[in-house]
Amino acid sequence: MHATTVKNKIMQRDNYKEIMSVIVVVLLLTLTLIAIFSAIDQQGISEMGRMARDLTHFIINSLQD
């Protein structure tokens, strides 16, 4: 009886850790998306397009070296 109780408590703790890990990942992804969209909004679409173009040229030039 005691071993079953201990086993159940360990399983509950593992489930709690797993649920908390999922919650943390979801929160971090949400904050990342908010930061990205906020940056896009502040810079404007044309500015983001210019930055993407510059980054693409940089990557292509780096690969050619």
UniProtKB/Swiss-Prot annotation:
Its main location: membrane. Induction: By acid stress, via the EvgS/EvgA system. Keywords: Cell inner membrane, Cell membrane, Membrane, Signal-anchor, Stress response, Transmembrane, Transmembrane helix. The keyword Phosphoprotein does not apply. One of its GO terms (cellular component) is plasma membrane. Disulfide bonds: none annotated. InterPro entries: SafA. It is a single-pass type II membrane protein. Residues 40-65 are periplasmic. It holds the Pfam family SafA. The keyword Transmembrane applies. It is found in: Cell inner membrane. The chain crosses the membrane at residues 19-39. Residues 1-18 are cytoplasmic. Interacts with PhoQ. Connects the signal transduction between the two-component systems EvgS/EvgA and PhoQ/PhoP, by directly interacting with PhoQ and thus activating the PhoQ/PhoP system, in response to acid stress conditions. Belongs to the SafA family. This is Two-component-system connector protein SafA.
